Structures are given as C-alpha cells and as structure tokens.
C-alpha cells in the first residue's frame, strides 16, 4: 500500500467538507497512510452566470478531476454522486458510495414558512429543472428564479434578491451545519430528488487494485444498490441536469424499491412510476421503472424537452 495518497476535490466549502469526511473515515481504518488533498475548479464552478441546463451536463463538476486521475496526478476524487455522469470516462470507476444522508430537497424560507404557507406568487430560487417542474405541478402560482453559485452564495441571494424561499439539497445544508435554517424537507410526493442526491461517491482508476481495496472500507452496500438503480434509470432515459427527472430508491424488507418521475418543464404533466426487485438486481430495476415511465408518456415528454433545448 502506498504510504501517501493524493485526493482530488473541488474547492467549494461543501466539496472540501465531503472530501475531508471521506479522508477521516479512511484514516481511522488506515492509520499508516498519509492523505493529501488537492483542490481544483471545474467548468461548473467557473460558469456561474449561465443556467446549468444551457451549459450541458457531461462531467460539468467532475471532468477536471477525472483528467487529473487519468494523468495519475491524483489517486482518487470525491464527488457528490448526483454530479457524476452515468457514463464515466474509460479507465475510471466508482470505487465507493458512502452511506447516504437525507436524499430530499429542503426549503429555506425567509421567515421559516413551509411550502404550503408561502404566499400566492411566491418567488422561489432554484436552478434545477427537476425541482422547477415538480414545484410548478404542485403550486402553479410559484415564480421560479434561477439560482447558481455555491451554497454560501445561494443563501445570500435569499436576502439580496428578496426571494420568499430557496430550494437546496438537504444533505449539503446539513453537512455545512445549517440544518436549523431548514423550514421543511419537501415530501417525495411533491418533489422527488435528483438521482444519487445525498450520497458521497469516490471515483478512482479501474486498474488501481490498492485504491479499490482501500475504498471497500467506506462502501455502504444499501446506498450502493439504491443509487445504482437510480443511475440505471437515468442512463436508460438518457437524462442529465437539463432533463426534469427525479428518482429515489431504498432498501425495505430486503427488497429494493424505486420511485421515479418525468415531468414537462412547465409542470403541467408529471408521470410517476415505481417498481421493486431483489437488492442485487439494481440495474434491472432501474431499466424496468424507466420502461414504465416511457410507456406512460415519458418518451413524448423527453422528446419535447430535448427538442426545445
């Protein structure tokens, strides 16, 4: 085993928190190994004035780290799983998926009001088409405003742009120690989360058995299965950041359950499907639920969304 391992991370406060957390877990299990964190900015970190849907999604928050891995400048990289494309560059693999935190979306409102308590025509900040579509389906009166930037920036915009509320991933808020600011975790019946939301993943080289073996110690089997089902569904639907697809999978009574949604951008139509399978059939479950969505009208919705890009 190498005695010094170089770990890649984006340089945002949340990304660094997640990377340090992974390193801490590995240090407990491997006290003789030294870990060094190296940070870099990704394309998604630099292009803050453009909506995610307009930039495209392939490796927006991962590519620079992946290039560094392939060039052997770093040994592995820590990501939010929801930022990882469903198809990874040749030679790279997800070496571990850690135990998932709350996968839901959280509402932070200026006066602590819940979603149902917000006034008619409330201005809500979010840049996710998935959130926009589902929220408009629930409350067509909402005025949705684009919201980019890191977590600190987004929190400031709640006040500076006089928004009634902003929607962020609950896990990120909690990791930053801001859970007291959450007015409500939005129920899945209202808004299903992004694929992989709430889970931290570690990407490494496929041909690096030492690192792969090291990462086994932080893998969480149930989270891995659940997120594999979600990513399989997304891969089948060929969806990325710019497509309104939500999904959530979990293990219940030794069965893997998956619920997913496809929506029109304006929220006028939301198609929901679910399925279950054995825990070791995650990929099959994802495809099965994706096929249900397509048959129920999801195919037409996705074609229309892509035609309008």
From Swiss-Prot:
Q: Which residues carry this modification: S-(dipyrrolylmethanemethyl)cysteine?
A: 241
User: Pathway of this protein?
Assistant: Porphyrin-containing compound metabolism; protoporphyrin-IX biosynthesis; coproporphyrinogen-III from 5-aminolevulinate: step 2/4
Top-level division of the source organism's lineage: Bacteria
* Gene3D superfamilies linked: Periplasmic binding protein-like II, Porphobilinogen deaminase, C-terminal domain
Listed GO MF terms: hydroxymethylbilane synthase activity
Q: Which GO terms describe its cellular component?
A: cytoplasm
Free-text cofactor note: Binds 1 dipyrromethane group covalently.
Q: Name one GO biological process term.
A: protoporphyrinogen IX biosynthetic process
Q: Which cofactor does it need?
A: dipyrromethane
Q: Which CDD domains match?
A: PBP2_EcHMBS_like
Q: Which reaction does it catalyse?
A: 4 porphobilinogen + H2O = hydroxymethylbilane + 4 NH4(+)
Pfam families per record: Porphobil_deam, Porphobil_deamC
The alphabetized UniProt keywords are: Porphyrin biosynthesis, Transferase
Q: Give the EC number(s) under which this enzyme is classified.
A: 2.5.1.61
**Keyword Metal-binding recorded:** no
EC class, as a word, reads transferase
Q: Does the keyword Protein biosynthesis apply?
A: no
Q: What else is known?
A: The porphobilinogen subunits are added to the dipyrromethane group.
What this chain does, per the entry, is described as: Tetrapolymerization of the monopyrrole PBG into the hydroxymethylbilane pre-uroporphyrinogen in several discrete steps.
Concerning its family, UniProt says: Belongs to the HMBS family.
The entry describes its oligomerization and partners as: Monomer.
Q: What is this protein called?
A: Porphobilinogen deaminase
In which organism is this protein found? Desulforamulus reducens (strain ATCC BAA-1160 / DSM 100696 / MI-1) (Desulfotomaculum reducens)
């Amino acid at each position: 085993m190498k005695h010094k391992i170089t770990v890649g991370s984006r340089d945002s406060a949340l990304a660094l928190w997640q990377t340090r957390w992974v390193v801490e877990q590995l240090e407990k299990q491997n006290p003789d190994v030294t870990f060094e964190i190296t940070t870099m900015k990704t394309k998604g970190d630099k292009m803050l004035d453009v909506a995610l849907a307009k930039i495209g999604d392939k490796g927006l928050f991962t590519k620079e780290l992946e290039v560094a891995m392939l060039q052997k400048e770093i040994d592995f990289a820590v990501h939010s799983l929801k930022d990882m494309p469903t198809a990874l560059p040749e030679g790279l693999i997800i070496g571990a998926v850690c135990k998932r935190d709350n996968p839901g979306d959280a509402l932070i409102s200026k006066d602590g009001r819940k979603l149902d308590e917000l006034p008619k025509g409330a201005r809500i900040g979010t840049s996710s088409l998935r959130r926009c579509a589902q929220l408009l389906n629930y409350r067509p009166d909402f005025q949705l405003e684009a919201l980019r930037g890191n977590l600190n920036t987004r929190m400031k915009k709640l006040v500076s742009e006089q928004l009634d509320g902003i929607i962020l991933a609950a896990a990120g808020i909690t990791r930053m120690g801001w859970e007291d600011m959450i007015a409500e975790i939005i129920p899945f019946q209202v808004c299903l989360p992004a694929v992989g939301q709430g889970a931290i993943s570690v990407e490494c080289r496929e041909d690096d058995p030492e690192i792969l073996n090291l990462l086994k110690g932080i893998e969480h089997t149930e989270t891995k299965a659940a997120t594999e089902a979600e990513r399989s569904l997304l891969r089948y639907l060929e969806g990325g950041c710019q497509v309104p697809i939500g999904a959530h999978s979990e293990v219940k009574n030794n069965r893997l359950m998956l619920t997913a949604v496809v929506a029109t951008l304006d929220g006028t139509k939301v198609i929901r499907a679910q399925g279950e399978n054995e825990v070791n059939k995650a990929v099959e479950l994802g495809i099965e639920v994706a096929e249900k969505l397509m048959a129920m009208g999801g195919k037409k919705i996705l074609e229309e969304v892509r035609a309008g890009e």
